[in-house]
């Protein structure tokens, strides 16, 4: 009996060690994805493309991992909320005053209507094709998305050379907001980049780089938040306590990395064109092509 007891204890110990090693690996993986998410979400280089590329490199591509990459975007969104809290709060108060207190401001303001018009096309398209979008999360589609998205950035830069440009975010019109929202639908193609679609789209419709970037960040809040919550609900039965802890770790990492990335990007984007980002996209697409061919 003592031998059986010792054997069972050894087996239990081995299982615990293996489980611990597996949990550590999952934690490291979640931190890596959080870093990648924070670095790429708000740059016009496709965060989804980078996340899927990392998942393929680490050989851990499955539906649950794809869901994880979507949900940890909540951390990146919280960074935008922190950076632009005063503007977001101001928009909300203007909306509340108009609806409940019938107060109208004669000055032009970026308001909830602009955000709604900028997100409405994406919401409608996402609701229609939600189940099918995941079918194109493959490296081949990402490669083409990177190339076409890079060309779109070059088109945006060509338009940016024309004057005059909208240089104050409060001067964005409803039509411009809606058109940028239509461009945002291009981001359903993995590799195209939501930031690339909206920033490039903003340049096409007459915004300067910084204002186009800021509006892109504002549009990210409802779109990414809605996508993450919908994905979380869809996979709710598959998420355990350990998964929740890993999501928190990945989201927290994405939050702090995105804080740095967004602030630095806003400092340089007014004087630095999007051409370097387009070149990077072409090089990354070439690397993916080389990897697929070897």
From Swiss-Prot:
Keywords: Antibiotic resistance, Cell inner membrane, Cell membrane, Cell shape, Cell wall biogenesis/degradation, Hydrolase, Membrane, Peptidoglycan synthesis, Transmembrane, Transmembrane helix
One GO biological process term: regulation of cell shape
Catalytic activity: di-trans,octa-cis-undecaprenyl diphosphate + H2O = di-trans,octa-cis-undecaprenyl phosphate + phosphate + H(+)
Entry EC no(s): 3.6.1.27
InterPro entries: UppP (IPR003824)
Protein name: Undecaprenyl-diphosphatase
GO CC, alphabetical: plasma membrane
HAMAP family: Undec_diphosphatase (MF_01006)
Any further remark recorded for this protein: Bacitracin is thought to be involved in the inhibition of peptidoglycan synthesis by sequestering undecaprenyl diphosphate, thereby reducing the pool of lipid carrier available.
Annotated TM spans: 2-22, 27-47, 65-85, 110-130, 135-155, 172-192, 215-235, 239-259, 272-292
Gene Ontology MF annotations: undecaprenyl-diphosphatase activity
Top-level taxon in the UniProt lineage: Bacteria
UniProt cross-references to Pfam families, sorted A to Z: BacA (PF02673)
Known role: Catalyzes the dephosphorylation of undecaprenyl diphosphate (UPP). Confers resistance to bacitracin.
Places the protein is found: Cell inner membrane
Originating organism: Blochmanniella pennsylvanica (strain BPEN)
Membrane protein topology class: Multi-pass membrane protein
Matches recorded under NCBIfam families: undec_PP_bacA (TIGR00753)
Family statement drawn from the similarity comment of this UniProt entry: Belongs to the UppP family.
